Amino acid sequence: MAATSLVLTCASPLFSSPRVISATKKLTTELSISTAKFRRRCSGNNDEVLLEGMPPEYYDDEWQARQREKTKELRRMQREEEEEEERKIEEYREIGTRLKEFPEQDLRKARKLVSSFIRAAEEVEERIEEAAEKGELDELVLMIIWNRLDLARRDDEKDAIRSLDLLYRRVETEILKRQASPAMKLLNDLLNMHDGFEDDAWLKDCRKRMAETFPREDPFSILMPPGFDIDMHQGQLRPPIETETDNTLLRVDFVREVDALLQEVRIEEDATTGSKGEGLDPEAIALKFKQQEKQRTIRQIEAILDLALNLKW
C-alpha cells in the first residue's frame, strides 16, 4: 500500500488544469522568443528584432552618443559636487582643529558671547561696542562666528547665512577699529560724521575736528603746553607731565597714512576693473551697489585728504 502511494505521488498528474497549461505555454513561448532574439543579435543579422517596449531611438547611434555625453556630464557634475562637499567638510575640520588649541574656558566664554550677539537682535550694535570696550572681542570670537556660518552654508540656510555674515563683518570691523592707528581711527570717525546728504556741512565739521585734533604747526604752539591758547595768550605755562605714551597725532602723519591707504585701494580697484556687475540677477545688482558704495567712500577719503593738506588754523 505504501509503495503504491509512492508511485502515485511521484507520477505526473493525469489531468492538468487549464490555468497551469496556459501558464506553461506562455512561459515556453517567451523563452523561445527571448532565445530567438538573443541569437539574432549575436549573429549580426540586419533584420534584428527590436526589443519590445524600447523606443526607436534606442537603436540610433547618434542618440546613443548623445546619451553617453549626457552621462559623462552628469558624472562630472557629481564629482564637482562631491569635491565641493569634501572641501567644506575639510574647512569645518580645520576650524574645529584650530578651536581645540584654545582653552575650554575661553571657548565657553566666546560661544556665550556669540550667542548673546545673536539674541540681541536690534541691540546687537550696542552689545558689540560694549564687548569691544571690555576687550572681549578677539580672533576666537571671529572663528566661532565663522564656524556657525560654515554650518549654515552647508545646510543652505539663507537667512542664517545673511545674519551671520553681517555679524562677522561687524565684529571684524570693530576689532580692526580698536587695533587701528590714531590716523585710521580719526579717518573712520570723519567718515562716520557724514549723514549721506550735506557734503558742505560735513566738510565743515571735518575741518573743525581736524583743527581740534592736530597741533598747530608753528614754533610757538610747539613750545607751549597743551591747553594754552596761543591767540588769547591764556593758559598755564607749566610744562606737561611726561607720560610713557604720546597719542598726539600730527597732520603730516595723518596725511601720510591716508595717502598710503588710497594708493592701496586704487591698486585693488585697477585689479578688479573687469569684474563689474552686469545683468539684473540679484548677485550682479548687489555687486554693482557694493562697487558704487566703495567709489563713494574713496571720493570721501580723497576729500578728507585734500582738506588735511590745505588745513589752516
UniProtKB/Swiss-Prot annotation:
InterPro entries: PALE_CRESS. Disulfide bonds: none annotated. Induction: By light. It comes from the Eukaryota. Its main location: plastid. The keyword Transit peptide applies. Disruption phenotype: Impaired chloroplast development from proplastids or etioplasts leading to reduced chlorophylls and carotenoids accumulation. Reduced accumulation and maturation of some chloroplast-encoded transcripts. Leaves are pale with enlarged intercellular spaces, and loss of differentiation between palisade and mesophyll layers. Partially restored by cytokinin treatment. GO terms for biological process: cellular response to light stimulus; chloroplast mRNA processing; chloroplast organization; leaf morphogenesis; ribosome biogenesis; RNA metabolic process. GO terms for molecular function: RNA binding; rRNA binding. Expressed in green tissues, including leaves. Accumulates in chloroplasts of mature stomatal guard cells. It is found in: Plastid, Chloroplast; Plastid, Chromoplast; Plastid, Etioplast; Plastid, Amyloplast. PANTHER family: PROTEIN PALE CRESS, CHLOROPLASTIC. This is Protein PALE CRESS, chloroplastic. The gene is PAC.
